Amino acid sequence: MTPLSLIDPALSEQDNEHWLRFVALLQQSIAEDLQLPLLQLLLTPDERTALGTRVRIVQELMRGEMSQRELKSELGAGIATITRGSNSLKAAPPALKIWLEAQLLSADKP
């Protein structure tokens, strides 16, 4: 498997450092079962809702049963958000797509 790059080309060097610090903090919070209070501290209710919507967008795009316009109506998301999700999914590493499929498309997942 090809190692994933830790550097996000969309971010500046300093922003990458901040992002990686957040990821490390989140990983540590998961190890200590503190991820929910951490995310509630760092994210507003609207940001948490937006993340949930983005997960649903990725899930439905992977399922492939609805058009982007149908997703817009179903989820109340903007077409630009759905298009970004679609483009990001196309560019995602194959290993991530396989993992997401197992997480989001298995019959027993909510």
Curated annotation (Swiss-Prot):
One of its GO terms (biological process) is negative regulation of DNA-templated transcription. The keyword DNA-binding applies. Residues 68-91 bind DNA. It comes from the Bacteria. Keywords: Cytoplasm, DNA-binding, Repressor, Transcription, Transcription regulation. InterPro entries: Trp_repress, Trp_repress_bac, Trp_repressor/repl_initiator, TrpR-like_sf. It is found in: Cytoplasm. One of its GO terms (cellular component) is cytoplasm. Its main location: cytoplasm. The keyword DNA-binding applies. One of its GO terms (molecular function) is DNA-binding transcription factor activity. This protein is an aporepressor. When complexed with L-tryptophan it binds the operator region of the trp operon (5'-ACTAGT-'3') and prevents the initiation of transcription. The complex also regulates trp repressor biosynthesis by binding to its regulatory region. HAMAP family: Trp_repressor. Homodimer. Belongs to the TrpR family. This is Trp operon repressor. It comes from Pectobacterium atrosepticum (strain SCRI 1043 / ATCC BAA-672).
